[in-house]
Every structure is written in structure tokens, then in C-alpha cells.
Amino acid sequence: MAPFFDVVLLGDGELLLPAFIDALQELRGSPRRERLLRLAQLPGVYVPSLYAPRYDSDGQLIAIDPLTAEVPAQVAKQTWRGNTLSHSTVITPEAAWPSIHMVEVVRSCPELCRFCLASYLTLPFRTPSLDDGLIPAVEAGLGATRRLGLLGASVTQHPQFDELLQWLNQERFADTRISVSSVRAATVTHELASILARRGSKSITIAIE
């Protein structure tokens, strides 16, 4: 990986980015190797040039060894377990999904279908609470736009998704267009379809495709 990546962050940005950005600012102007060594000491930060792959006689990878004792032998993925997931911080008509406030409802998926990278790369399955996580995240963006996107590999499997739907069915959201990312076929209900239709959705993506 070293010819392509200087640094790889393993895990969730909520944990990785604050320390990573602070370290970059502290190291501004430092020699390249010093910067890479310092970054490699942060939890969840992998610097490929400071490690070497080791293979057996058949060419099978058996280990990835650190080239210096200053970096950890293994880099552990960092897993965010807070009560909030990500949501849009910049809302603009120039975005790929223009003028829409995105809110992450779930991270990963409990089904773990073998073909689905979204499930495995972001394990474990996590859900923020409705009152302290999702509702504040939704309201944070609706002052800037009346378009809301609910994101996740299987948003309808949030344990409080029905309550979220009822909350979004209030009259004060009558002018808000709501769309959802993929949902499992078994979780599509008449209530879900009706509320989404009333909020401007014309289609949904159903998994497994």
C-alpha cells in the first residue's frame, strides 16, 4: 500500500479525526519521516511505509511486520460508541445530493449479508437513541433546508424507527421532503410507504436486490 497511501485511518472518524488533525497541526514544517512516525503512534493510524509484508514459500502473506520499534506491531480499528452518528455539516445546492440534510440512522447492519461491504467494514451495528441522538441531528439541518435524507445500510432496522416515522409525520414537517437509503424488503410497511409518499418520496431502494 505504501506506493499509494501515506497514511490510512482505520475505524470511525469521530474518534480518529480530532487527534489526527491536532497531530498534523503540531507537526507542520517537520521532516516527512518525523511526521509519519508521530502519526503512526496514534491509535488507529496505519502508515504503510513503516511496515513490511512477510510471505511464506508459496507467496501467501503470513505477517506484516513493523520496520521500527517506534510503531505498534498491530493497528487497532477505532470504534465509535457514542449516542450520535454523523450528519451533514455543509448543505449546498452544489453537492452531489443538492440541498439535502443527511442524517445517519444506523451504522453497519445486523443481517451481515456476505456480499455487503457496508455491513462488515463498519461493524459493530450501532444505533443512536431517538430523543438524544436522531431528533437533534435532524433538527440541526432543517433550518437550512427542507430536504432530509435518512442514511444507513438498513435504516428501518433501527429499534426506534417507527417512533422516528411518527415524529416526522407531524404537521410541522408537511413541507419537508424525506427520502431513505436502502431498506430490507421485509421491513417495508404500508405506514412507511404512506408517510414517505406524503413527504415527497417517489421510490425506495429495497435490499436484498
What are these regions (language model features)?
Residues 6, 45, 108-109, 113, ...:
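Conserved structural-core and active-site-/substrate-pathway-adjacent residues in large, well-folded domains
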Residues 17, 101-109, 133-141, 168:
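Structured alpha-helical segments in the cores of large, soluble enzyme domains
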Residues 48, 54-102:
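N-terminal [4Fe-4S]-dependent radical SAM core
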Residues 134-209:
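Conserved SAM/AdoMet-binding glycine-rich loop
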